Amino acid sequence: MEKDSFKSVMYEYTEWPGDLIPYDDLHFISHRYNKVLGLCDSKDILEIGAGSSIAKKEMVNLSKSYTGIDISEKNISRLLKECEGLNLSLYVDNAESMQFEDNSFDLVIALAMVYYLDIEKFLSEVKRVLKPGGILFFCTSNVDVPGFHSAPGSKKYLNIGEWNEILRHYNFSPEFEGGFPQKSIIKLGLRAKLISHIKAFIVDTLGLNSLWRRARELSKGSLTSIPKQLNDFPEVKEELVKIKNHEDKIHKIIYCKSYNAS
């Protein structure tokens, strides 16, 4: 097994039902999938980084067609078993060079994974496979919030201004929203500096991604099992805030809905 390969990291960081994670993280997962379900109705959908089986049944039932890709063979193999009986298509594929024909999808979804990709190659491919007027929907961590930590294996994080610029370069019309405001900004800013040094030593120097992940999980408190069904997740009443000036240093999660303007 290629322990430190990108595919291995993708498999390790995929959130599967039954996995133990900090309770607060359930809110992030539930929120992003419920946002997606509001966009799925009668659409041909492509989910990039399909990974986990969370909300697959709901997406399949709402959509006209569901297609999912993941670069990890292990993720797709497990997903095929857990989604047996659902009318969907799953492939091992690279989001930077996809197998699909032009103008194939109404909606492309990329949840909490765009920072693992070459953004320009990714957007070029999404532009190609989206139908005119189609939607790219993704969520990502806000790099401008104090306390931000990059994920092991990630390539690059963009702030909202940078996202706006590159999306418009590819002729998308983006709308941004922020969710889950950070607390104690000043205190977290100082704490983040210390944590970044610790992380650099564990991940970059020692190469121990799994140790860092476990340490971060324990720092967030007690762990809980990820439910199998989306309606078993805790109810999330988080209200999103529209971001109009392309700058935000408060919200931990950024949601972007971009229309294919071509």
Regions found by a protein language model. Name each.
Residues 172-183:
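Conserved S-adenosyl-L-methionine
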Residues 121-135:
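A short glycine-rich, Lys/Arg-flanked "PGG" loop and its adjoining helix->strand segment in the class I
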Residues 52-97:
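Class I SAM-dependent methyltransferase SAM/SAH-binding core
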Residues 147-165:
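Acceptor-substrate binding/catalytic loop of class I
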Residues 137, 184-262:
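A C-terminal cap/extension of S-adenosyl-L-methionine-dependent methyltransferases
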Residues 1-40, 43-51, 58:
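Conserved class I S-adenosyl-L-methionine
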Residues 109:
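A conserved beta-strand element that flanks and buttresses the S-adenosyl-L-methionine
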